[in-house]
Amino acid sequence: MEFKHTSVLLDECIEYLNINQEGIYVDGTIGGAGHSSEIYKRLGEKGCLVGLDQDSFAVETSIKRLDEIKSNADFKVVNTNFKNIKSACSGLGINEVDGILLDLGVSSHQLDEASRGFSYQHDAPLDMRMNTKSELSAYDVVNKYSEQDIYRIIRDFGEEKWASRIAKFITEARQNEPVETTYDLVDIIKKAVPSSARRDGPHPAKRTFQAIRIEVNNELGILNKTIEDCVDLLKRGGRLCIITFHSLEDRIVKMQYNKMVNPCTCPPAFPVCACGKKPKAVLINKKPIVSDIRELDKNPRARSAKLRVLQKI
């Protein structure tokens, strides 16, 4: 089995990480080591790359690919979620780093591997776990959550207009027999979404699948704390690069970045700051960096990618 994944905004990430040959860099979502390979190539003898991934197959693949690169730099790959970035680095004797990269997209490998159940384009058991050792699966969400909870997830995490109908149709369908596969779920969603709404736009199941995946992996719940931990871990002048793929993630990253840049909680009417909270960082790019037309031609999945960069002060 091969780990297939095209790295998004690769050149931009390398540029904005502003790599120091002797620095320490963390790729919190190493995947197939697409971004990490280019970081690693730019490190000298005293440099170090740390990779994290909760997918054990990604860990195995990234180690093999990094081993193939001729470099005097050191690298370490840890099988863990990026929410554990501080403890993972501490376990390696690392207390501060020069740069951190987080690519929040599901890898092409995970989407294309039908058995993982991420894709509405392949029939597979409902799974969607990025960490296959996790207990909660998409099957559990679809078959065990209440109609109200399913509605809330699809509405909030999928921003789906037809969330109420989809939740109702799911709970009605499972009364007859469990919803076991991705195609079972797709069929239910297609019945729930009016035909007029299915004619235009993305696949009718796209937003619901996104929402369930976010719930299964607690993707948004861990993001706020992770950003705080990343900034704490950075040296002064170190940079945090985060790539998002949907508006919910991007909104969280933007808000957390703004808190780091302007943490003051004083009322606007106050002439001077009285809360004493000092900025921890500056924005490198006020607007998100997006893929150019050349990258979009090669990799359509990059269309929704946004890169935001923060520098610790």
Swiss-Prot record:
Keyword Transferase: yes
Record-listed S-adenosyl-L-methionine binding positions: A33, G34, H35, D53, F82, D103, Q110
Keyword Methyltransferase: yes
MF-aspect GO terms: rRNA (cytosine-N4-)-methyltransferase activity
UniProt-annotated location(s): Cytoplasm
E.C. code: 2.1.1.199
GO terms for biological process, alphabetical: rRNA base methylation
Protein purpose: Specifically methylates the N4 position of cytidine in position 1402 (C1402) of 16S rRNA.
Matches recorded under HAMAP family: 16SrRNA_methyltr_H (MF_01007)
NCBIfam families in UniProt: 16S rRNA (cytosine(1402)-N(4))-methyltransferase RsmH
PANTHER family: 12S RRNA N4-METHYLCYTIDINE METHYLTRANSFERASE, S-ADENOSYL-METHYLTRANSFERASE MRAW
Protein name, as recorded: Ribosomal RNA small subunit methyltransferase H
Native species: Ruminiclostridium cellulolyticum (strain ATCC 35319 / DSM 5812 / JCM 6584 / H10) (Clostridium cellulolyticum)
Name of the coding gene: rsmH
